């Protein structure tokens, strides 16, 4: 349908051009000519050519939640990074740069941050951004408690605005990771949100807090703004020309994030020049076909992500540590790596090895059938495995996941486990993992670190705060582990902090909390007429910032 609409639009444009060219020129009534004036050189009408829009289109696994207090997956994070500004911005070196905050002061005790805001920043309605908007945005994500709320509100004592250009944030304990966490505090206009808030809703005097409206609109100040958003199909954004920042001279005028990963559709769109960049969820076979299209390349991009088999620690038979260890020893990791893009590596820790603070000296699980059988013999379900099947749910939008599920099924069947493999849409898996009763034995999910250090990913993957979200199907809910993570994150000295990360790493390995498969390398097929800084390693790999549209150049016919 989209293709037909696009084709119709092109036909209409061509028709208008042809009609303009064929229209009769203005004439005057001819007079009787006895003598003729010398011929004068004629010039064609000087109508300015209509500038061709630069368009960028990328496919994503859907849905795309663009409410800054709700979205936290890949599509949502990429959209939010372009629609909203943040106080600081992640750089390619793993640190942060000034953004809405041009500078900040830190108190001697390390617990009070005073941010000085950039002047003249406009929201998409033309109103000026003020410090009170920062406070409102923080309060909103804290009260709603979704999205990246667990990250940006953790350990924060208070947020205030003494004047329009100053924000003061006080934290409970010094933390080296507080400042980087602010790349997830997307600043929304208080006035715009309030003007579109329904009085009735679950947030007391805040009604619905603008959640219904913000599903399909934005209240940001970022380089792009929502033009239209039919929820199930695509998000269309247009350049915000009053953005305070600097655009690539060839930055797209419009960007369309398309909600499909279906291989035939993607290939057709690329062949027809109706897609500039694919999602990262195509199969190896699909990437091979895409790479044969003229003007298309496939780029491997390092990430902060890992591929997890999230093992439910609360349901039989995986609530028994010996069954979990049997699984971790019984999986053929090396064979699994051959199913992926060349160059991927087995996960050697509970978080990706690309993160600072991973202890590479800690032993990790390798394929060892004898050890797997020895552990299984100690499992309390050893004699009744047929009565306690392992339910594996893989994401239908990521077809390559089926190969891993079938390999897992074969490996575990050899040990004596009964395994049922289920193909489910991403939205269904998100819903299933939200409640213990509906959580499968294993959910197969890619997770990207919110920040480029191990501690934050231990928090987002294994702390009680993320149980009941798609980021944790393990349901650990262990106060002792929570305390370890909190203590490590509050440790300012890097050497001491990394030592505490090592202890957490050993703890999770000893529990066999998950089946850790491989450190992800994203693959994107892209048209070579698009200038992508991320392909050259010039962007942060914090999820969503790889495709910051203001830095992308489009020079496609």
Show the residue positions of the predicted features.
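N-terminal lobe/hinge region of extracytoplasmic solute-binding protein
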Residues: 59-108, 139, 219-221
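Surface-exposed binding/hinge segments that line
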Residues: 150-202, 230
């Amino acid at each position: 349908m989209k293709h037909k609409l696009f084709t119709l639009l092109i036909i209409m444009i061509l028709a208008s051009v042809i009609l303009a060219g064929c229209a009769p020129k203005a004439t005057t009534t001819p007079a009787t000519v006895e003598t003729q004036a010398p011929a004068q050189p004629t010039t064609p009408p000087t109508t300015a050519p209509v500038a061709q829009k630069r368009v960028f289109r990328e496919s994503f696994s859907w849905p795309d939640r663009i409410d800054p207090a709700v979205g936290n997956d890949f599509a949502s994070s990429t959209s939010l990074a372009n629609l909203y500004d943040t106080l600081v911005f992640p750089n390619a070196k793993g640190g942060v740069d000034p953004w809405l905050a041009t500078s900040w002061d830190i108190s001697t005790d390390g617990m009070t941050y005073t941010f000085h805001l950039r002047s003249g920043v406009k929201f998409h309605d033309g109103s000026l951004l003020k410090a009170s908007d920062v406070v409102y945005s923080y309060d909103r994500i804290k009260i709603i408690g979704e999205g990246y709320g667990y990250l940006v509100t953790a350990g924060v004592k208070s947020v205030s605005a003494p004047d329009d250009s100053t924000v003061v944030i006080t934290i409970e304990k010094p933390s080296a990771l507080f400042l980087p966490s602010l790349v997830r505090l997307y600043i929304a206009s208080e006035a715009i949100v309030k003007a579109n808030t329904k009085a009735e809703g679950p947030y007391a005097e805040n009604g619905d807090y603008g959640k219904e409206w913000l599903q399909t609109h934005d209240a940001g100040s970022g380089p792009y703004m929502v033009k239209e958003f039919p929820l199930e199909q695509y998000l269309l954004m247009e350049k915000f020309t009053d953005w305070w920042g600097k655009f690539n001279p060839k930055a797209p005028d419009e960007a369309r994030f398309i909600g499909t990963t279906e291989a035939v559709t993607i290939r057709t769109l690329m062949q027809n020049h109706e897609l500039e960049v694919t999602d990262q969820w195509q199969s190896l076979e699909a990437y091979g076909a895409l790479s044969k299209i003229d003007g298309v390349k496939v780029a491997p991009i390092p990430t902060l992500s890992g591929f997890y088999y999230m093992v439910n620690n609360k349901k039989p038979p995986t609530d028994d540590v010996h069954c979990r260890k049997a699984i971790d020893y019984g999986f053929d990791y090396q064979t699994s790596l051959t199913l992926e893009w060349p160059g991927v590596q087995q996960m050697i820790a509970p978080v990706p090895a690309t993160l600072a603070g991973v202890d590479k000296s800690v032993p990790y699980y390798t394929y060892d059938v004898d050890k797997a059988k020895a552990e299984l013999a100690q499992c309390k379900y050893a004699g009744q495995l047929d009565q306690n099947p392992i339910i594996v749910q893989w994401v239908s939008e990521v077809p390559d996941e089926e190969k891993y599920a079938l390999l897992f099924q074969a490996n575990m069947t050899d040990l004596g486990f009964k395994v049922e493999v289920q193909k489910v849409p991403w939205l269904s898996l998100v819903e299933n993992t939200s409640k213990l009763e509906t959580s499968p034995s294993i959910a197969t999910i890619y997770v990207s670190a919110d920040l480029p250090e191990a501690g934050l990913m231990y928090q987002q993957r294994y702390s009680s705060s993320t149980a009941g979200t798609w980021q944790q199907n393990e349901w650990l809910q262990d106060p002792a582990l929570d305390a370890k993570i909190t203590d490590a994150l509050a440790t300012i000295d890097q050497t001491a902090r990394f030592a505490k990360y090592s202890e957490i790493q050993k703890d999770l390995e000893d529990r066999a909390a998950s089946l850790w498969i491989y450190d992800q390398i994203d693959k994107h097929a892209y048209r070579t007429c698009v200038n992508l800084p991320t392909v050259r390693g010039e962007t942060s790999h914090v999820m969503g910032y790889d495709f910051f549209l203001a830095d992308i150049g489009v020079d496609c016919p």
